[in-house]
């Protein structure tokens, strides 16, 4: 009875993990008759970084091979490029360099570094997981703005279709 809302990561991420997390959150919201707040996983990853870097931030998650989910925003969390998926190459992200540094954070940083090979990119953390601590300020803002999800129609943001491979 002490809950005012439930916040959940909406993706991108693991298909199964997103399904389980969102189903659990929706169940709590239905049972307690409280609103659901969803936060982009990539925003959660970068939220802790915004207060101590200058320049644009790219949060990313390694999907598979050289493919990454990413989101680009400035250090005030204003989105510059919505969540996308891309096969990275040495020219990826060049258009997001500003007058200040470009910061990349997320999962799969070591693979990203090998592909980009760019000395002008700052990697503040070697690997950064989505953290519930980083969700707090993002969730509070959405709660105050009454930015809630429709419990019936809300679905995870998978970004791309499910990928199956044959057993080897």
Where are these regions (language model features)?
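N-terminal beta-alpha supersecondary unit
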Residues: 1-8, 129
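DPxDG-like acidic metal-binding loop motif
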Residues: 5-41
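Glycine-rich, flexible loop/turn motifs
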Residues: 11-14, 18, 45, 57, ...
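Catalytic-loop motifs flanking and including active-site residues across diverse enzymes
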Residues: 21-24, 89, 131-135
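Active-site catalytic microenvironments for nucleophilic, acid-base chemistry
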Residues: 31, 48-52, 138-142
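Surface "functional belts" at beta-alpha junctions
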Residues: 35-129, 163-164
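Acyltransferase
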Residues: 124-168
């Amino acid at each position: 009875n002490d809950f005012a809302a439930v916040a959940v990561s909406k993706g991108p991420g693991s298909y199964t993990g997103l399904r389980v997390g969102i189903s659990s959150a929706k169940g709590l919201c239905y049972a307690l008759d409280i609103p659901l707040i969803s936060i982009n996983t990539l925003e959660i990853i970068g939220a802790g970084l915004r207060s101590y870097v200058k320049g644009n931030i790219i949060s990313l998650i390694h999907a598979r091979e050289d493919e990454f989910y990413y989101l680009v925003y400035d250090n005030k969390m204003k989105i510059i490029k919505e969540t996308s998926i891309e096969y990275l190459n040495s020219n990826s992200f060049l258009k997001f360099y500003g007058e200040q540094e470009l910061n990349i954070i997320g999962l799969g940083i070591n693979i990203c570094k090998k592909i980009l090979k760019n000395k002008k990119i700052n990697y503040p953390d070697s690997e950064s997981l989505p953290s519930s601590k980083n969700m707090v300020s993002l969730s509070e803002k959405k709660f105050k703005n009454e930015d809630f999800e429709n419990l019936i129609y809300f679905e995870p943001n998978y970004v791309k279709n499910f990928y199956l491979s044959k057993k080897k």
